[in-house]
Amino acid sequence: MSLRRPPLPRLLLNNVSCMRNAQQILRHVNVSLHDGGALVLMGTNGSGKSTFLRMLAGFSKPSAGEILWNGHDITQAGIFHQYKLQLNWLSLKDAIKDKFTVLDNVQWFEVLEGKQGGSLPALELMGLGRLAKDKARMLSMGQRKRVQLARLLAIDRPIWLLDEPSVALDGDGVKLLEYIIAEHRKKGGIVIVATHLPIQIEDAMILRLPPRFPRRMTLVDMLDRGG
């Protein structure tokens, strides 16, 4: 009787260190994510969360250690080409064209992916179905973020890298975000979130980034010290 080897993690950070502007952000991080896994990067503004996400996306290399996808180093040219096709990236820049309709702003990305038919249902799920034919310039900041989330659903890649996904969302929008993350994970998708705001993601691993700069003393701090 032969023993089965445990499955490789889909994504493995092996003793990874990350630097920005010659400053260490994280040192010797070890994380393994299997299908359906989630990682939350917590930290204040300026702590390096976006830099860390960009490293996971392959835009920069670790200062030490390695990032493995299916057991292969993502910095290798042939591997990176395959790896990047697995990624769905949501950044603080929404890339929404104001002159296009709301539907066009999702459909264009779906067509580039070689897919069709998912854009309108994605917008409807995000509560924007009635605005599909409106120009995107009419959208509020929260609605623009919902358009970005609709793109995630329409493109439907397995690994989501989400940079501050709840910023500009109201309470209902945050609940929708948490719902689509949970549904993506049920299908075996992986979610990595960088945030300074609370978000409910069941069984997620938490990685806390130390503040890059000491917090400035406020009037409340001074009064506390004086008391």
Predicted feature residues:
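Conserved ABC transporter NBD signature motif
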Residues: G65-Q76, H81-Y83
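Conserved ABC ATPase "signature" region
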Residues: G117-A132
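Hydrophobic anchor residue at the start of the ABC signature
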Residues: L149, G188
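Catalytic Walker B motif of ABC-type/P-loop ATPase nucleotide-binding domains
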Residues: W160-E164
